[in-house]
């Protein structure tokens, strides 16, 4: 998993290799889209702050897949 602020786990060599192979332009554009979602989505103001949106990266033998997900902040790692 690649989660912002997650300092609990040292990334594996496979994870580092997969991340280094990612097209940075594509990744930057994806992050820009993610960061604009709360402002552009039709969330009620009180609901907009209770979900975090992130990327899940799965790396398997020369194949990297990215998935968009959201989760309630109450389940974030502290």
Swiss-Prot record:
InterPro entries linked: Bifun_inhib/LTP/seed_sf (IPR036312), Bifunc_inhib/LTP/seed_store (IPR016140)
GO cellular component, one term: extracellular region
Tissue/organ expression: Tapetum of anthers.
Claim: Secreted is one of the keywords in the record: yes
Localization, UniProt: Secreted
Leader sequence segment: none
Keywords, comma-separated and alphabetical: Secreted
Family to which this protein belongs: Belongs to the A9/FIL1 family.
Protein name, UniProt field: Protein M6
Lineage of the organism: Eukaryota, Viridiplantae, Streptophyta, Embryophyta, Tracheophyta
